[in-house]
Amino acid sequence: MPIRVQDELPAVNFLREENVFVMKASRATGQEIRPLKVLILNLMPKKIETENQFLRLLSNSPLQVDVQLLRIDARESRNTPSEHLNNFYCDFEDIRNDNFDGLIVTGAPLGLVEFNDVAYWPQIKQVLEWAKDHVTSTLFVCWAVQAALNILYGIPKQTRSDKLSGVYEHHILHPHALLTRGFDDFFLAPHSRYADFPAALIRDYTDLEILAETEDGDAYLFASKDKRIAFVTGHPEYDAHTLASEFFRDVEAGLSPEVPYNYFPKNDPQIPPRASWRSHGNLLFINWLNYYVYQITPYDLRHMNPTLE
């Protein structure tokens, strides 16, 4: 089944060029199917690029997915036209009384910013508190993982001395876990973060189950036993060129970044990179939609089962 989006969203034409089945809202109204309602809180600066990445992954499920985009930062964006935000994004007040099957909270380039210095930190806390009673399952990505661990579990910000950037190998810990069903025993995924996620920290201070980690003991994928919250510390949604764009941006800014690990062929930034994580990213999102959202969400969202404690 396709994803459902507003007719004029730029991602419609972009994804159709990749043979992705996108159904405009005007056509979807003629189908007697209860789609999954998924809300995306997009915290990334280049919002259109991020929309394309997540919509691509959501589109590969056999389930029909109705996507709504949420913003909580009222400041003028330097990377996304205000017309786009006004046309395709809702504010929290627009949806605070609604229920959703799923919520995705994206990453954000805030790894070196203290939580209380984040301009929209109060709004982040508000959304996470609201989600306990209004969302069946929430998926946190990269920086959002760090924010959620602080808000939900009181874990202080853990920061690496150097940025972790590259494509790293991970291994699954529970072969029969639903979120990793169909995963290879070892798989690759991109990372781009200052945030640090030692697996020992997650085990010692939360009741979350770690499902995949690196050989160095960094947690990559973990979730609550009731499937209400899931965390992925990398960026499985990234395009093949995203890490390269970040690298060259930092080079131009005079930051002397390290070449992303295991990314450029022959470790040469002049050779175009290839994505080695695409199948993993697709399977992760299919599993989340199926086992963490579809299998446990009520048919009538008015019968949402609160609350996440």
Swiss-Prot record:
One Pfam family matching this protein: HTS
Catalytic activity annotation: L-homoserine + succinyl-CoA = O-succinyl-L-homoserine + CoA
GO biological process: L-methionine biosynthetic process from homoserine via O-succinyl-L-homoserine and cystathionine
Known role: Transfers a succinyl group from succinyl-CoA to L-homoserine, forming succinyl-L-homoserine.
Organism lineage: Bacteria, Pseudomonadati, Pseudomonadota, Gammaproteobacteria, Enterobacterales
Enzyme class, broadest EC rank: transferase
NCBIfam families: metA (TIGR01001)
GO cellular component terms, A-Z: cytoplasm
Pathway annotation: Amino-acid biosynthesis; L-methionine biosynthesis via de novo pathway; O-succinyl-L-homoserine from L-homoserine: step 1/1
PANTHER family: HOMOSERINE O-SUCCINYLTRANSFERASE
Residues with site note (Important for acyl-CoA specificity): 111
Family to which the UniProt record says this protein belongs: Belongs to the MetA family.
Binding site for substrate: 163, 192, 249
Source organism per UniProt: Enterobacter sp. (strain 638)
Name of the protein in its database record: Homoserine O-succinyltransferase
Keyword Cell membrane on entry: no
Active site as annotated: 142, 235, 237
GO molecular function, a single term: homoserine O-succinyltransferase activity
Highest taxon in the source lineage: Bacteria
Alphabetical keyword list: Acyltransferase, Amino-acid biosynthesis, Cytoplasm, Methionine biosynthesis, Transferase
EC number(s) recorded for this UniProt protein: 2.3.1.46
Xref: InterPro entries: Class_I_gatase-like (IPR029062), HST_MetA (IPR005697), MetA_family (IPR033752)
Site (Important for substrate specificity): 192
